[in-house]
């Protein structure tokens, strides 16, 4: 047998073995989106007032995708762009939802687009009978390391000290302990100058708790102006934080983060309250931040997160996504499980039950694990949910989509 013939035969056999487990492209079911619904979970109490709305996208093929995020009005408008469309054209649908109206999507609408995008990827995985991380090329890590905010660990009480919380977090298997530099009761006085003195003592206690080989994180939560952020970062440098989170205000991040970078030596992380690829592009390229806080569904879903991850991988910047909800976290495990750079996720659901999600996250010993369940790997108990929205008709009012000659979507 000639070498060329042999190689061709081997390649064909390998392809046959691989494709034997999957439907051929031509055999993929033709389907259309027929209905989008949104629900509130039982006793909704979203962390930090973020949306825990559950979103479903139904198709005429009997496959339903599950997502999380958004609010009634922003979901209604974006969902209306999906009715009658093929859910397998995810990038095209994302571009349409993002570009079809006069104003570019702001943060609230981007969150809704992200929730719907998660459901579209869930459908894609279910069509192929594969977890989304396999659809995206396969996981590159065995698990995702996690950090725990405030040491919310079974057995730790409300009167536990910072040192006790930090120690318990590391002993539970988490990579890092996280606490807020600005944690005070709402509607009370906040003096940034005085808070920095308190901050130094708390950071010293956190370091003592995690030990010399453990990690800890402090969140400034944007409550410090630039001068106090500089002072705060320099005051705690000796205690070696894994990173300082959101040290300056969102409104000025493009100006203040580059300035802060030149004034301090601690690693910086930012972006939980803002962040599409254009927001992060220059900051990542110039290494003004060491870790990107981009998260789901806030950035616009998995479709947009993959592009942000590509920026981070190009410039060797890590990703430490903010926690928004359990379904979104399942999507993060699938999405960032395929990212080859450093990843650490926020997880605060240890010991908590989720009645509407009998199957969701695979968490053990401070780590989140990928699984082999199709799609995002989550299942809903519909009896636990309260419907707040149903969309069955396309939204065309004031929507205008334009196309290049090749059929790709261009600007409004």
Segments and roles (model prediction):
Residues 5-26:
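N-terminal export signals
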Residues 376, 380-412:
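Extended hydrophobic packing segments that form well-structured cores
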Residues 20-48, 57:
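C-terminal segment of N-terminal export signals and the immediately downstream linker at the start
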Residues 77-78, 85, 89-92, 234, ...:
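Shared catalytic-loop signature of beta/alpha-barrel
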Residues 36, 58-130:
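Metal- or metallocofactor-binding catalytic centers and their adjacent structured scaffolds
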Residues 143, 151-258:
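Metal-dependent enolase-superfamily TIM-barrel catalytic cores that perform enediolate-based chemistry
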Residues 1-2:
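N-terminal secretory signal peptides
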Residues 62, 116, 129, 219, ...:
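Conserved, mostly hydrophobic/aromatic
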